[in-house]
Amino acid sequence: MKVIIDGDACPVKNILFNICEHHDLELILVHSIAHMSKGEQKIETIIVDNEAEAADIMIMNRTKAGDLVITADTGLAALVLGKRAFVLSPWGHFYTNDNIGSLLDRRYLNRKMMLQGGRVKGPKKRNKEDDHRFQQALESFLEKHLRNSSKQEGV
């Protein structure tokens, strides 16, 4: 399993760096050239053009069944689920086949309202509880999936 980060607006990169290093997991950060930063030497970093969907296309090309993708992009999440990979939001909520339809519907309705001049409430300001919820969800997921993969290897 590898962990792939949609890094253009990911507020939990440092948490991911630490946890993936602790579990010795392959970590890939994908972001546009507009979001380059220092301090990403320990992980594989893929920098794409600053074009619409360039990072999403690269993420889809690199994702395999069983991988974990971190993104807040509902459209990308739907595509990743189609590859039988797992998707976790930076708020610690998993996108699943059971909830993706309603999330896509909400995204569509919000976009429609904005195009008609309406206002759509954005996400709340991020706080430490959000980081904690994300870290707990990630650790729980990894504990379960790494344990299952080691059982399968021992069979």
From Swiss-Prot:
Pfam families: DUF188. PANTHER family: UPF0178 PROTEIN YAII (PTHR35146:SF1). Belongs to the UPF0178 family. HAMAP family: UPF0178. This is UPF0178 protein Amet_2995.
